[in-house]
Amino acid sequence: MGKKQKENEAYGNSAKYDPSFRGPIKNRGCTDIICCVLFLVFILGYIVVGLVAWVYGDPRQVLYPRNSTGAYCGVGDNKDKPYVLYFNILSCAAAINVISIAENGLQCPTPQVCVSSCPQTPWVVEGFQLSNTVGDVYKEYRNFCVPAVSPDMVVMDSLQKGLCPSFLLPSTPALGRCFPLPNINFTLPEQLQINNTTVSKGISGLLDSINARDVSVKIFEDFAQSWYWILVALGVALVLSLLFILLLRLVAAPLVLLLIVGVLAVLAYGIYHCWQQYRELRDQGVSITQLGFTANLSAYQNVKETWLAALIILAVLEGVLLLMLIFLRQRIRIAIALLKEASRAVGQMMSTMFYPLVTFVLLVICIGYWAVTALYLATSGQPQYVYWVHNTSTPGCEKVLVNVSCDPMAPLNSSCPELKCTFTGYSSSGLAQRSLFNLQIYGILGLFWTVNWVLALGQCVLAGAFASFYWAFHKPRDIPTFPLSSAFIRTLRYHTGSLAFGALILTLVQIARVILEYIDHKLRGSQNPVARCIICCFKCCLWCLEKFIKFLNRNAYIMIAIYGKNFCVSAKNAFMLLMRNVVRVVVLDKVTDLLLFFGKLLVVGGVGVLSFFFFSGRIKGLGKDFKNPDLNYYWLPIMTSIMGAYVIASGFFSVFGMCVDTLFLCFLEDLERNDGSQERPYYMPKALLKILGKKNEVPTGGKNRKK
């Protein structure tokens, strides 16, 4: 006893009885004011970054294609002309890929015009037509010439000045551009030095994007056909998640016992299987000394030492679990009782189950704001125009300086007939552009900090609501009328700074992990094993640190919700309280994890199986109203339903997990504060009192306050 008391003293003294304490303290003050001010100033700066991005950014360069003058196709004056036609796409096809299409607008050294539709038939200017006028030759193809070209201009002049195309190829629109189709059964004049082979080679890289578009259309069609049934599947997931949590008060004990026995049975079968494999390979198998080290991991399946090592590991795990069942059965019973009480708390405050919707909306706002800001920052800059000549050997164009900046609105006073002022891209100069990297870093920091703050807000609000349930002596009579909304207002009013403090600590660790992941990605091709090993060790350490900080923050927010102290004091008190009851913490954590994992498996697996049999048409006789839709890819709505079910189950079970953690801390505080006397009665339910062998004294001449 003396040794245990000394260990407890090392982690602080037990909580003292406070006659005025009746659950979450209402008379509290603002905490971590400096962090609150810092967070608000940072948010103001984040808004300023968004305004700068809005002023200087132009996302149209990603969303819409541009012609040679830099005008956007599909908007403004070109609203009815959504596609770009390249007079000679082969001059830039070799440098085209999907990324450059999106980022650079596919600016190539060839004239580009906005068109209402892409060419459908092949066509070429014949030699005898060069002396005719544009109005006569391009009668049916004026849409493919520069709008400003005069119909009285000679065709030869229009070709030299790059005002009209010399040939047209059957094309298909993709990503807002007209890309030639492959296998064209058409022979072009030899002077153009273009043939079908050249066309096929030049645009082969673009066909992937065209095929991707066809796939995207099919995917859209599948969603249009199956969206209703996907919503039905998500509704089933919601009902299953809610039923699982509400039924835990009835089936928690047998379910936990069944899961533990199931784990023991799986380990026992693993031991048996490893023994069988080891016995077969003991006399005729290859030993580890004979095989040595090899990168072919499948080769180790025929090594007897592999199965022997697996057998030993599984046997140790089996033994540890059996010893835990024998010596920690009392703590397992406490964990089961807390799970039942958590189910009861959720049933009393059903509004808490839908709080994840608030968190989801706030996360969408945070992520959406960052994404829009990052897009506008990436597309900031003034348009740049340079002089360009189609053929510098043309008389009068030999001495023209190309790639020199110009003004597209100024008249071209030059002896070169082919001289153009062409759009090339956006500048990287200017205050916003020079600070682009720093602004993007600021935005990433803002993303992590705001997301972690929103998650912290949800945890603290739920903790306040569930704490008010536990510390209500007569349930449900003493539970506040609106526990969730009261906790929400209380948290925002007093503890924004504390949440920002905890979120900032977690953000810094996550940013460090991102930097390490980036360095590891850069070193992936490196042959230096020492550097790779060091990076791997740092990544492992930061992963463990992040997990620990998340655990500490979660319990700190519970203490903040109950007592209204600042972050550091709350984190210290929570840590000391948990360390004084470390065995109970481990048992409850593992039992809860096992139960929630089974719940997720049940919900996601059930929805997945039902979706598979329905969308694949394996369920017959459902009637006309329940006929499965005709789909191109039936796995698409199945995967969507499974992922949606996982998100819904995670949202519901995260609330339940927070409830268990909150009730557990309140239970530990209850044990330390109270002794069951009339002056200091326990607040825990009768099931926990019975397990612990404790009881509340009955007042003389009256009934026990405890129901």
UniProtKB/Swiss-Prot annotation:
Role description: Choline transporter that plays a role in the choline-acetylcholine system and is required to the efferent innervation of hair cells in the olivocochlear bundle for the maintenance of physiological function of outer hair cells and the protection of hair cells from acoustic injury. Also described as a thiamine pyrophosphate transporter in colon, may mediate the absorption of microbiota-generated thiamine pyrophosphate and contribute to host thiamine (vitamin B1) homeostasis.
Keyword Lyase recorded: no
Residue intervals on the Extracellular side: 54-227, 272-307, 378-452, 520-557, 616-635
Cytoplasmic side: 1-32, 249-250, 329-356, 474-498, 579-594, 657-707
One Pfam family recorded for the sequence: Choline_transpo
Glycosylated position list: N67, N185, N195, N196, N296, N391, N403, N413
Transmembrane residue ranges: 33-53, 228-248, 251-271, 308-328, 357-377, 453-473, 499-519, 558-578, 595-615, 636-656
Post-translational events: N-glycosylated; N-glycosylation of Asn-67 and Asn-391 is required for a proper thiamine pyrophosphate uptake.
Membrane topology per record: Multi-pass membrane protein
Name of the gene this protein is made from: Slc44a4
Name of this chain's protein: Choline transporter-like protein 4
Tissue specificity as recorded in UniProt: Highly expressed in intestine, kidney and stomach. Also expressed in testis and lung.
Main localization of the protein described in the UniProt heading: membrane
